[in-house]
């Protein structure tokens, strides 16, 4: 993973100190996830991954980002996709839809962008964001892997 850039904001470090550590609940693996970076590395191990972020959609701030390219500003993507998540949640509420939002897919000519809100009660207000190279990724497999990563995170 030497080609990746990882960024964790100082304000996030303070925020994380106030919250329990992320934990992996999958059997036969380390129980403790050292921090958000491990989850991001798992996301970036998905074939075709261009960038990953864990985002607080209350503030629009990326808690952590990991990127394989300098052309994708993940902080801008986090803020913009926060509006997408808020709009979808608001619309579901207005329509009286009482279902769980699993993910939101944005398809571009060369990329897929997958947004997956954390469904655990303790993780509410956060979402995973993954940008994929459309020519190198398998969307179904990427969504499946992202679901597994989301389920393994205990915030």
Regions found by a protein language model. Give the residues of each.
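Non-catalytic interaction/Regulatory regions outside core domains
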Residues: 2-155
């Amino acid at each position: 993973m030497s080609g990746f850039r990882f960024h964790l904001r100082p304000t996030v470090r303070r925020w994380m100190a106030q919250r329990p550590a992320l934990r992996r609940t999958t059997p036969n693996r380390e129980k403790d996830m050292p921090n958000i970076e491990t989850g991001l590395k798992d996301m970036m191990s998905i074939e075709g991954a261009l960038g990953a972020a864990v985002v607080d959609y209350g503030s629009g701030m990326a808690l952590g980002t990991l990127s394989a390219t300098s052309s994708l500003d993940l902080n801008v993507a986090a803020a913009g996709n926060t509006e997408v998540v808020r709009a979808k949640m608001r619309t579901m509420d207005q329509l009286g839809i009482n279902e769980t939002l699993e993910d939101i897919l944005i398809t571009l000519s060369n990329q897929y962008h997958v947004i997956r809100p954390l469904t655990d009660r303790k993780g509410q207000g956060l979402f995973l964001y993954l940008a994929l190279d459309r020519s190198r990724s398998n969307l179904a497999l990427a969504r499946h892997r992202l679901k597994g990563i989301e389920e393994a995170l205990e915030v």
